[in-house]
Design a protein with these regions (language model features):
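Positively charged, amphipathic and often flexible ligand-engagement surfaces
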Residues: 1-180
């Protein structure tokens, strides 16, 4: 059966970290937040964040506060799963690369990643975010992330990629009439 429950996904990511820790040539592993969270919850958070003003983290906090109590509880579990995986990477000295997602769910992924960096990247680099370079807004995001790291005193980790969703994103932008 191909579908895994989020807690099973978390446990599998932790097993990957445990294995990587025994292999000198595997210094990191990748995580997709969509393995921990309902896509529609990420979409809702992203939409709420886009309707708010301010920094990424201010918009994130506003969005989380705007969720129903049930959704807040669900999101709390997502954060806990991510924190457990990141904690395992920290304990085993294995980097955790948070993969990029589609633009319409990326903001909560970025916010969650910043939260994890703020916890785990104080004295060493453990958590990395992913920047899809085809996106027109990512240079500003990189600068804002650097500013957050300076202000909160954590080490900023970034993986730069072309972007796996480039064609899909371009088609969606053309259909919906926004800049790709």
């Amino acid at each position: 059966h191909l579908f895994c429950m989020p807690d099973q996904v978390k446990d599998e990511f932790k097993k990957v970290i445990d294995y990587a820790a025994t292999q000198p040539n595997i210094p990191f592993m990748s995580v997709k937040v969509t393995g921990f969270a309902r896509f529609s919850l990420l979409e809702k958070l992203d939409e709420l964040m886009h309707n708010a003003t301010g920094s990424l983290m201010k918009r994130y906090l506003h969005a989380v506060e705007s969720l129903s109590e049930t959704e807040k509880e669900e999101w709390h579990k997502v954060r806990l799963r991510m924190q457990q995986v990141c904690d395992e990477g920290n304990k085993k000295n294995i980097g955790v690369l948070i993969d990029a997602e589609e633009t319409w769910i990326q903001d909560p992924v970025d916010a969650l990643t910043i939260l994890m960096m703020d916890v785990f990247n104080k004295s060493k680099l453990v958590i990395y975010n992913t920047i899809q370079l085809y996106r027109h807004d990512r240079l500003v995001f990189l600068k804002d992330s650097y500013q957050a790291a300076e202000e909160r005193n954590f080490i900023l980790g970034m993986k730069l990629v072309r972007g796996a969703y480039m064609e899909k994103e371009g088609e969606r932008a053309a259909t919906m009439g926004y800049v790709s």
